[in-house]
């Protein structure tokens, strides 16, 4: 019997159609990637290839205008340690920066809708990104699944530009201003998503952090008014173009209160089910017949501070919960940081390879 390619196996698993092998998937911070090359893979080695990971991101889309100097007027000072991204958001780094930077918001002082509407938000076109289709085909020919990455889809992109406190105040007391910000971001994100969909990606990876460690970031009423309908419109347009595309949605933190909204919006897979915030068995029993999952192995607890045996037990236990049909791409819930020992990373990969379906 012909075995499935890594791509076929992953897509079957995420669609809860059974699977042959458990995929290995994780991301390393730069220092861990360096130690991988020094201690395990060799100079220049690709850890995704080394561990046989079944998917690759096709790459970030290129905006029509790549000249970031158009954002300079939104800042009082452009510092040497500051970078401005393609959305115009400033990032100040420091010698101790590992994963995050100090973020500067170009529209934090805006008071009028006209200031939002005149903001030079990036424009993305199919013509500028015709290369995506070739990249998708290249990955598929290698038997790998293709991923269009759009984490920071609506909420995070909007507050990156406006500032979180400002945007939340707008949502409560200046709805016209909030509408202008969200409309601007929704249009840009929809354009990006459609480029990926038309290029034929297997998976569209969306996301906005809408949870905190032990609670949701906003009320259900605010979420259903501001974010849910925009996400649903975006996904609906994508699935009109590519009905079989798999949509994964990322949000750190506790978000159980929002899961039904996400399912109704058209999400197929939820990431990461942060182990320190939510119990996977409970979440699976409530929602596992309608949605699949990616993650579940804690990066605040078992990955950095557990034993290799505990890592394996977590992996096998969660796979047992999901059962033979799949529905769980078991993986660490976040980027692996320097405190995670290689013994635990290798134990995770071994657990995936050693797992026997019950």
Each model region followed by its residue ranges:
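Short, solvent-exposed loop/edge-beta patches enriched in aromatic
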Residues: 18, 51-56, 76-79, 140-142
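Active-site loop segments of alpha/beta catalytic cores
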Residues: 1-40, 84, 93, 116-358
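Segments that shape or occlude catalytic/ligand-binding pockets
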Residues: 33-73
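A contiguous, low-structure linker/loop signature
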Residues: 69-119, 141-145
């Amino acid at each position: 019997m012909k075995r499935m390619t890594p791509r076929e196996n992953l897509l079957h698993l995420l669609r809860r159609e059974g699977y042959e092998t458990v995929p290995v998937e994780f991301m390393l911070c730069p220092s861990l990637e360096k130690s991988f090359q020094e201690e395990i893979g060799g100079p220049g080695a690709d850890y995704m290839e080394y561990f046989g990971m079944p998917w690759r991101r096709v790459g970030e889309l290129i905006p029509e205008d790549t000249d970031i100097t158009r954002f300079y007027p939104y800042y009082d000072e452009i510092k040497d340690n500051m970078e401005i991204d393609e959305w115009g958001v400033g990032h100040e780094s420091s010698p101790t920066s590992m994963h995050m930077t100090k973020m500067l918001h170009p529209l934090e002082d805006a008071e009028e809708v006209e200031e939002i509407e005149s903001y030079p938000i990036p424009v993305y076109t199919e013509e500028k990104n015709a290369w995506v289709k070739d990249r998708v085909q290249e990955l598929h020919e290698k038997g790998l699944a293709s991923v269009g990455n759009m984490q920071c889809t609506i909420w995070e992109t909007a507050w990156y530009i406006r500032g979180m406190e400002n945007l939340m105040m707008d949502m409560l007391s200046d709805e016209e201003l909030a509408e202008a910000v969200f409309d601007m971001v929704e249009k840009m994100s929809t354009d990006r998503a459609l480029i990926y969909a038309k290029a034929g990606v297997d998976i569209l990876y969306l996301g906005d952090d809408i949870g905190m460690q032990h609670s949701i970031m906003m009320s259900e009423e605010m979420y259903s008014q501001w974010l849910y309908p925009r996400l649903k419109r975006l996904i609906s347009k994508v699935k009109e173009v590519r009905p079989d595309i798999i949509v994964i949605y990322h949000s750190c933190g506790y978000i159980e209160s929002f899961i039904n909204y996400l399912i109704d919006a058209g999400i197929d897979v939820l990431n990461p089910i942060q182990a320190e915030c939510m119990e996977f068995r409970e979440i699976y029993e409530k929602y596992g017949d309608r949605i699949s999952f990616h993650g579940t192995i804690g990066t605040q607890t078992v990955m950095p501070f557990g034993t290799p045996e505990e890592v394996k037990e977590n992996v096998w236990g969660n796979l047992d919960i999901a059962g033979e049909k799949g529905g769980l791409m078991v993986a660490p819930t976040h980027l692996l940081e320097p405190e995670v020992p290689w013994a635990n990373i290798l134990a995770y990969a071994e657990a995936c390879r050693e797992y026997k379906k019950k």
